[in-house]
Amino acid sequence: MEVIMNSSIVKLPNKYELVKDTLVLILAGGRGSRLYELTDKRAKPALYFGGNRRIIDFALSNCLNSGLNRIGVVTQYAAHSLLRHLQNGWSFLPAERGEFIDMLPARQQIDDSTWYRGTADAVYQNMAIIRDHYCPKYILILAGDHIYKQDYSQMLLDHIHSGAKCTVGCIEVEREKATEFGVMAVNENLKVKSFVEKPKDPPAMVGKPNTSLASMGIYVFDADYLYDVLEREVSSPYTSHDFGKDILPKALEEGVLYAHPFSRSCMGRNTEGEIYWRDVGTLDSFWQSNIDLVCENPQLDIYDQSWPIRGNPVQTYPSKFFYKKENARPVDNSLISGGCVITDASISYSVLFDRIKINEGSQIDHCVVLPQVTIGKNCKLKRCIIDRHSVIPDGMEIGVDLELDRQRFRVSSGGVVLVTPSMLKKLNGEEVASEAHLD
């Protein structure tokens, strides 16, 4: 395809050439501090989601579905479970065809620093490998901790057609929630006119006083431009080594920053045509995003085979339900993964991961239960997140009396109760030793 740019005819690559010349970098080193104990021993991208997936599976699946198969995963905090997941579930790309998912852990490279100092520094510290070994023309940078379906090839096409050197993915959000994002304004050609990172008073969109245009943390760069701007930025005494705070403002200042609306490349909309993108960075948002999946027509369709979300499901026996009571309605509007054993218990509006045992008389209502949990007899759990390997003793009630729960567990601002094995051990007076979290 040929277009006119700056009074010259330029031949643009087609989609196949474009994805072949693109390296994807997934930033997966975040701790997720607002998830508290849920990410104490695992990186946020390694957190379970949707019954038998992990959060990073969405970014990785989007890449493969978009035709992108040259991928680097940049890791840092508590990376062991993430690395095991990638090795066990994502090692199938054929290296002989130039396809790969490589791990890029934080390590001593440029100077004596061993930790990445920010999102931009995570790329800068690996720049020699990227430039000299992978040799891309374009670099797609993704966050590894968001839930969504997107065709990145469309964003890449928009990037080259606009003549941008940097393109940022954007989505409309409620203005009152935009304080957690970078917020921008664009002209009719989607060239970014202003950008501010996490403003206290987010600017509204023209004609939409209650809506702001927010960054999704997804960026496409011309590789040569990214190398240049990172080299210049690292020498600045005022840099915070962050894409939103430093790199995007620099691209804006130089007039090469464009926006890509998520609506142009969103995949898997529901029957109402709604787009879906979630940052599950809090206990409430993590719980709600999982519970949303149990409704009849969820915004996120995890059963859509036209845009599949791959993962590393555990090999288990089928789940078993055993009920002695007649006319019982044991399971209602719930997701139940493999290897679960449910005996005379009621489950409603809940997501159960693999290998969970629930004993007779227990009631599970609006709960997200992570793998290998045992729930005793006659328990009552409501609006809970139960972390992996937890053992709930007979007769325990959680989510019924939030004041009592605040003394025993962690209660979110939205009234969701987080329960972990360590909390239960402390409650029983057991000593809690520091232990590796192999999940």
Curated annotation (Swiss-Prot):
* E.C. no: 2.7.7.27
Q: Which domain of life is it from?
A: Bacteria
| Family annotation (PROSITE patterns) | ADP_GLC_PYROPHOSPH_1, ADP_GLC_PYROPHOSPH_2, ADP_GLC_PYROPHOSPH_3
Q: Which InterPro entries match?
A: ADP-Glc_PPase (IPR011831), ADP_Glu_pyroP_CS (IPR005836), GlgC_bac (IPR023049), GlmU/GlgC-like_hexapep (IPR056818), NTP_transferase_dom (IPR005835), Nucleotide-diphossugar_trans (IPR029044), Trimer_LpxA-like_sf (IPR011004)
The leader peptide range reads none
Q: Which Pfam families match?
A: Hexapep_GlmU (PF24894), NTP_transferase (PF00483)
The set of disulfide-linked cysteines is none
List residues binding alpha-D-glucose 1-phosphate. 116, 182, 197-198, 215
Listed GO biological process terms: glycogen biosynthetic process
Q: Does the keyword Amino-acid biosynthesis apply?
A: no
Pathway in which this enzyme or protein is active: Glycan biosynthesis; glycogen biosynthesis
Instruction: Please provide the record's keywords in A-Z order.
Output: ATP-binding, Carbohydrate metabolism, Glycogen biosynthesis, Glycogen metabolism, Nucleotide-binding, Nucleotidyltransferase, Transferase
Q: What reactions does this protein catalyze?
A: alpha-D-glucose 1-phosphate + ATP + H(+) = ADP-alpha-D-glucose + diphosphate
What are the protein's GO molecular function terms?
ATP binding; glucose-1-phosphate adenylyltransferase activity
The cross-references to Gene3D superfamilies, in alphabetical order and at most eight, read: Hexapeptide repeat proteins, Spore Coat Polysaccharide Biosynthesis Protein SpsA, Chain A
CDD domains the UniProt entry points to: ADP_Glucose_PP, LbH_G1P_AT_C
| HAMAP family documented for this protein | GlgC (MF_00624)
Protein family: Belongs to the bacterial/plant glucose-1-phosphate adenylyltransferase family.
Subunit structure of this entry?
Homotetramer.
Described by its record, this protein's role is as follows: Involved in the biosynthesis of ADP-glucose, a building block required for the elongation reactions to produce glycogen. Catalyzes the reaction between ATP and alpha-D-glucose 1-phosphate (G1P) to produce pyrophosphate and ADP-Glc.
Identify this protein by name.
Glucose-1-phosphate adenylyltransferase
Q: Which organism is it from?
A: Pasteurella multocida (strain Pm70)
